[in-house]
């Protein structure tokens, strides 16, 4: 693996891997580029994926793999520059990233322009004419918003307040929430926004709580989900609080403490695989991956953002051998063959659900990729 030296020093293992690759030239080396938010406001989302890449095998489909990991510093303009460098200079066969929606959106422009498959590590939404080269590793916002509203409806929620990011991720959630809320008779009584780098949401929370909603949905991610959670609780709110799948992780509980108790969130199977039915297709892949990841990074280090990247590995292990039958890596023909293979390999059980990409479904997941959790006694637990 190569971590771009501009951003990350090579570890000894990585250095040896690179040296070995130089001594023994590859017959058909596959180059995988990854762009994550390892620093900046969204760094909590990029650390797990970076660590996940370090566990990837040195070969896929019998061919050597070169991995280049770059840090976009939570900046979409950096993501664009890195994507162009990966395609034009490094001749990558696929780009993974970014871990935040604005960055993934920026990379998607390069992907479609250059005909390079992208495995987005955030649930970026694209206009129909921009689809074609971008596949998503997390669940779609549409899938998770639908499940969230359905749970609220079962809980008797009639009015909902929205408190979320003022970017593409937040707006996508707001749009899907409104659509699903209208369907079941839940009224959106407030929609307040804040920036990812904001340090206070007091004014927004005061306006939101003045509408007395039955439930509040916080649309934030990683460590950024704790500050609005604390503000809502500190202002005396006693209704139901929901977080999105980008916040359902130990990080929220660590930062919000007891103020996280009772919070609901929909997430993928990888968050609590031991609580899945024994016949769930993701139970075993997730349990095995947690053991592998924590053996390398320490107990309690695992999160669903790393699991998304493991899903990328598993689907590439199915698609790359198919693409190799018709083209050589490092060529436009191989990139197209890989794109086509991703669309046709069929169901692949991954830690977050069952991926089944098609030409018309670049999200891949179905209802098996979501379940409801609640913070109980400092732990995310599955609930009805």
Enumerate the language-model features and the residues they cover.
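Sec/Tat signal peptide C-region and signal peptidase I cleavage site
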Residues: 22-28
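Extracytosolic ligand-binding ectodomains
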Residues: 2-5, 13-14, 28-384
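Bacterial N-terminal signal peptides
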Residues: 11-21
């Amino acid at each position: 693996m190569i971590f771009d030296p501009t951003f990350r020093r090579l570890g000894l293992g990585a250095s040896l891997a690179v040296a070995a690759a130089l001594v023994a030239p590859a017959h058909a080396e596959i180059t995988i580029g990854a762009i994550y938010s390892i620093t900046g406001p969204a760094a909590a989302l990029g650390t797990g994926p970076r660590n996940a890449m370090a566990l990837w095998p040195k070969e896929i489909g019998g061919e050597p793999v070169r991995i280049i990991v770059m840090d976009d510093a939570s900046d979409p303009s950096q993501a664009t520059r890195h994507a162009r460098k990966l395609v034009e200079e490094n001749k990558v066969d696929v780009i993974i990233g970014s871990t935040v929606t604005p960055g993934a959106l920026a990379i998607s422009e390069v992907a479609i322009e250059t005909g390079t498959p992208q495995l987005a590590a955030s649930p970026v939404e694209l206009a129909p004419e921009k689809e074609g080269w971008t596949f998503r590793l997390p669940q779609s916002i549409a899938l998770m918003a639908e499940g969230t509203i359905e749970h609220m409806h079962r809980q008797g929620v009639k009015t909902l307040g929205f408190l979320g990011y003022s970017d593409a991720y937040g707006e996508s959630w707001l749009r899907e929430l409104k659509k699903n809320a209208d369907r079941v008779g839940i009224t959106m009584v407030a929609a307040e926004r804040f920036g990812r780098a904001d340090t206070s949401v007091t004014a927004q929370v005061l306006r939101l709580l003045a509408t007395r909603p039955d439930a509040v949905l916080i649309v934030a991610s990683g460590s950024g989900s704790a500050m609005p959670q604390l503000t809502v609780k500190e202002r005396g709110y006693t209704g139901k609080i929901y977080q999105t799948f980008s916040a359902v992780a130990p990080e929220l509980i660590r930062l919000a403490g007891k103020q996280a108790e009772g919070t609901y969130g929909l997430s993928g199977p990888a968050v609590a695989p031991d609580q899945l039915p024994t016949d769930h297709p993701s139970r075993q892949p997730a349990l095995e991956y947690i053991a592998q990841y924590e053996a390398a990074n320490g107990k309690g280090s695992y999160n669903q953002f790393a699991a998304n990247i493991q899903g990328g590995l598993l689907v590439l292990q199915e698609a790359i051998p198919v693409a190799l039958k018709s083209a050589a890596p490092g060529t436009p023909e191989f990139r197209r063959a890989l794109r086509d293979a991703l669309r046709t390999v069929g169901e692949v059980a991954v830690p977050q659900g069952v991926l089944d990409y098609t030409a018309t479904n670049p999200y891949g997941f179905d209802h098996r990729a979501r379940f409801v959790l609640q913070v109980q006694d400092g732990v995310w637990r599955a609930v009805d």
